[in-house]
């Protein structure tokens, strides 16, 4: 999710 420390799609 947005703001998480791991790279991921919005």
From Swiss-Prot:
It catalyses: 4 hydroquinone + O2 = 4 benzosemiquinone + 2 H2O. Its main location: secreted. One of its GO terms (molecular function) is hydroquinone:oxygen oxidoreductase activity. It is an enzyme of class 1 (oxidoreductase). Optimum pH is 2.2. Activity declines sharply with decreases or increases in pH and is absent above pH 6.6. GO terms for biological process: lignin catabolic process. It is found in: Secreted. Inhibits HIV-1 reverse transcriptase (IC(50)=0.6 uM). Belongs to the multicopper oxidase family. This is Laccase. The lineage of its organism: Eukaryota, Fungi, Dikarya, Basidiomycota, Agaricomycotina.
């Amino acid at each position: 999710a947005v703001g998480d420390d791991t790279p991921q799609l919005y």
